[in-house]
A protein has these predicted regions:
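A common structural junction motif
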Residues: 49-56
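Intrinsically disordered, low-complexity Pro/Gly/Ser/Thr-rich segments with frequent PxxP/GP/PP motifs
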Residues: 128-155
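Short proline/glycine- and acidic-rich turn/helix-capping motifs at secondary-structure junctions
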Residues: 1-4, 56-69
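Primarily secretory-pathway and cell-envelope proteins
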Residues: 63-132, 137-138, 167-184
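A short tyrosine-centered beta-strand micro-motif
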Residues: 157-168
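Short glycine/threonine-rich beta-strand-turn micro-motifs
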Residues: 1-2, 14-45
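Extracytoplasmic
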Residues: 27-29, 52, 90
Length: 184
């Protein structure tokens, strides 16, 4: 466990190490959470970082299908990508959230991204796995920014359409906001 901790805290952030989002001691295991959790990435972890029969990987195996949809505007709150398309190697994408609701609106930083697969289904893309619980206040008429991160060194970006999701409560109703962008 100490060896794993030293590697995780080191400055040498290889793609295999950047794929690790957390680890801890279970009752009889070392539990590891990966940003992109596939059999191949688990083997990469064992080869490059740490191999032990005590390792147990958490969560479902990727890719995880997520065909949900959302809205770009709801009761005066709107969400859109700063640009309609970005280069394939992009690691950061900005989204503008605008308030024309007639009252103050508070938004946070948590989000998720899906990409369209060759079969037409949408699958979850590895992004930031933890977010600071913060509230950004927008007065009526103001706009703010949510910055999303992609990790092409963990899962190479493919050309195509992507969906950015941000969920918030408005008037007691959970609203799934969605904005699309393209990588090419």
């Amino acid at each position: 466990m100490r060896k794993l901790e030293r590697k995780f805290l080191s400055e040498d952030k290889t793609p295999a190490l950047r794929n690790v989002v957390g680890f801890g001691m279970g009752s009889n295991s070392i539990d590891v959470a990966l940003r992109w959790n596939t059999k191949e990435k688990q083997q990469e972890f064992r080869r490059q970082i740490y191999n032990s029969p005590a390792i147990r990987f958490e969560g479902k195996l990727d890719p995880i299908v997520d065909n949900r949809e959302g809205v770009s505007t709801y009761q005066g709150i709107s969400l859109k990508a700063e640009k309609p398309s970005y280069p394939l190697g992009t690691t950061e994408i900005r989204f503008t959230i605008t308030n024309h609701s007639g009252e103050e609106f508070v938004y946070g930083d948590a989000y998720s991204i899906t990409a369209q697969g060759t079969d037409g289904n949408w699958f979850v893309v590895p992004t930031d796995c933890s977010f600071t619980a913060i509230g950004h206040v927008l007065s009526d008429g103001q706009s703010g920014t949510i910055t999303a991160h992609l990790f092409p060194d963990i899962l190479p970006n493919k050309p195509g359409v992507y969906r950015f999701f941000y969920k918030d409560s408005i008037g007691g109703e959970k609203v799934p906001f969605m904005a699309t962008f393209e990588l090419k």
